[in-house]
């Protein structure tokens, strides 16, 4: 087992700081009313990328930047839909993984540009399902990724929504965590991820997790997304 590269207290501090900066970025996106009708998803992504560079000097993201609007919000991360213009009454979600001084953040939120009650209902359910997942994680000390995935899907169903992804989260850490830990099923919150989530990675570091919620309303043709650190904060 390799010696961990950073003291665990420092790792926790850095991961929380990275998430705090991501939250500040998203707050500024809202304050500037950047999510607006009439622009394309890619244009908004580029504008947010420029804002992250201005605010925090961010030049890299550990995964591709995701801006999804309208029917594209039904699609999981792995899909690559054509660029879509954001409509004035759209639902939009952002999923960004900025790197702050070599530490990864992963943050996702959903925004509704109209008074549509169905879109607001889905958006408002997202943090409730996320919190239900965290509560389950906190109360089940030996929980596996597969168990938390199953619980999260059921929590979504209890709110009246479908589940839009093949995962409910993943490992996060020093960049690049995928090279440090690998991309095996056990490093995701997903079916067949059967190891206890409270464990160390191959380098001897404690595993820290992102919980991500992707709710969909297939009948009304839209979805929403919400993610942040599961075990910290």
Give the positions of each predicted feature.
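Active-site neighborhoods and metal-handling regions in enzymes and metal-associated proteins
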Residues: 1-233
